[in-house]
Amino acid sequence: MDLSWIVGAIAMAVLIAWYVSYGAARLDRLHTRVEGALSVLDAQLVRRAEATLELANCGALDAASALMLAGAASDSLEAESADQSSREAIESDLTQALELALGEEALRRLRVDEALGAPLLQRVAAANQRVELARRFLNDAVTDVRRVRRKPGVRLLRLAGHADLPQTFEIDDELPMLVRGT
């Protein structure tokens, strides 16, 4: 055997090892990005629930709306350890409760109350906007992981190991009435 064949085989083995190592490290970084984005989303969901609970307890809303918001916000705060599909449903319920409670009349009353209502309304709007952004970042990270894990080399060499395939977080988080008027 010629020396050039041996050098070529070693170079090819090094190249393959580098490719596998690079792919595994990239996939690990993407999974870490998903975990970080999930933590950020969780924190933003808690902030939104806390802001909603403060709004419910401020006294500027009618009793039925305040009770509905307080119940939905409390459910959201208690759902931190729930599985993802349950958490998605609970967070969507909180958004729906906000939509129902914050009708035109309630929004007008809150915006007029500059001492308490308007700042709390702005806090809920800002918290909801941060939830929307955090959810987008998470879903983008999940999409990137799924794209890399679909590659034949990653599947063939099982570079993902035993890591679960991450799932997107799908909730109703749009509150157009807060975006327009706040």
Kindly give the residue locations of the regions a language model identified.
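A helix-centric hydrophobic-segment signal that preferentially recognizes long
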Residues: 2-182
